[in-house]
């Protein structure tokens, strides 16, 4: 039985009077590698910002278990966020600090560990992502793929239960991207973490994703959710099929009828709940 880790209900994202996405309702289950996908400018990274507490919804709820992120007090929100690790698109490493010093930042902020203990943890995290021996290297001295892995090591510093990635494959060659995909799978399986990824890289989506939501810029809402591979095979939504097949295979909706959201891999009970649940 699946257990929801993050519950998004009736979420509307807006900048002032401009609505970017509305009425988003979906669950990220524990152990998922959950893909946020859709065309350019549809609001993927903005949704990620809502999930990690950097942007407040215009309407709706983001819940971690039984706790509503934006209704919680500062201490409760801080507790939730300490359970999250984030890898930004640019890796966001401090260029003036070594890799070990970068990883030490959250440990120094949120723990009472000694310098020696922090150094040991930094070395362990770097070894976990294949960077053993690179503690004293600066970001400028390593490749783009290694920077991504170092950023991932820092994201794991506090042993989070959920990891967020914003376009992790951006700027990587196909081999480095494939290696990063394998690393994400290994970490999910070995650490039992939930993973949420913003990406439009189809190879990564199909290689590691088991659940997803598809955002549409034109209708300004989600038009599909579920296993990406199942959506590619079964979706009747033209936009979804075109995206997932690079436009090589079309499946037009019924003539004169706007396509509704595809809910592949979702039980009837869950679908009913997604459509009707209000907090």
Region spans (language model):
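Helix-to-loop junction immediately C-terminal to a conserved catalytic motif
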Residues: 52
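A short, proline-enriched helix->beta-strand linker immediately N-terminal to the Walker B motif
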Residues: 157-161
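Catalytic Walker B motif of ABC-type/P-loop ATPase nucleotide-binding domains
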Residues: 163-166
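Conserved beta-strand-loop-alpha-helix hinge in the C-terminal portion
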Residues: 218-244
